[in-house]
Amino acid sequence: MLETLGVWQGIADEAQPVTEIEITDSSLEAGIRPVLLKYENRLTEDGGSEPASHIVPATALERALQASVASDPVLTVIAPAEIARFTDTGSSVAITLADGTEITAALLVGAEGRRSASRDAAHIKTVGWKYGQTAIVTTIAHERPHNGHAIQHFLPAGPFAILPLPGNRSCLTWTEDADEARRILALDDAGFLAEVDKRVAGRLGAVEVVGPRQSWPLEMHLARAYVAPRYALLGDAAHGVHPIAGQGLNLAFRDVAALSEVIVDAMRLGLDPGSLQTLGRYERWRRFDSFMSAAAFDGLNKLFSNDWLLIRAARDFGLGVVDRLPELKRRLVNEAAGMTGDLPRLFRSERL
């Protein structure tokens, strides 16, 4: 999608291809963490292969998207800005910003994240729950090269992922019990590095924390509706999922591609892009897929964020079986890459 939109070339130099994903399941104290499942490059339809995924710094993605928007003469950026209220007038949506500026449009899209103010103003309720877990993210430099390998350690408190970045650097993202996370985040630099060392387990040689510590509480929420008259939700405003599979951004991209396709198709047919008839197609397309993804990630978190002996034995057996079935692994890699199901045209490298 990013290539089709002409954005990828502004990101490629900072993107790290992931050529292999290793999955382990063990306790924090285990000195040896055997690899139970290994994914390699994703097979393409023409019989070739490409990286299973890419790790892209958020700053690089934001910079490339902002540059693309700034270079388009038909787009007007009003930022920073906050919506005070909006009203469906029947033929348009009347939007009033906090500074009093008034805007009229055919459609308003709520994409401002989990705490979406526009979603609340549209009276769209959500359903969900808190996990009692906290995500911790930082960046490390390390002695040994990662060779483009991503590692997912399933530990009793939750997954610990080592995601490769350009050079001898990696992004760490791990899930901890909320109380334990508070303890870890309050440590001094030496104490925090010791916690990192325990989890990296010598895999990358000597390590150094080179990025800030970031954290946020984990929860799941799903909007009860994705659309209202002249209003549509997408991304985290529509669905907040557990990061166990790292698919939150990819789900948002699918929303963007699907909504764009629905709007363009409607306008080509002379239809109203903000009508419920038009927006209903988007909701039918994306709501069920997002629900199934959220349910799957929720189930994976419950399955792997515990240390029950019987459950561990069963899940390790299951991972071993998957590792021995190449076709199933291929399907799972394509699923993780967001390349299955009813794909929008932008996901098939087709322009709208």
Task: Identify the residue ranges that each predicted region occupies.
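Residue-level signal for inorganic ion chemistry
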Residues: 2, 65, 162
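Conserved FAD/dinucleotide-binding core of flavoprotein oxidoreductases
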Residues: 33, 38-47, 155-217
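FAD/FMN-dependent oxidoreductases across multiple families
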Residues: 180-276
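C-terminal helical "tail/cap" subdomain of flavin- and related membrane-associated enzymes
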Residues: 261-352
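Conserved N-terminal helical subregion
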Residues: 11-121, 129-134
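Central beta-strand plus flanking loop segment that forms part of the substrate or channel wall
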Residues: 115-150, 168-170, 176-180, 196
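A general structural signal for well-ordered alpha-helical segments in protein cores
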Residues: 20-21, 58-62, 66, 133, ...
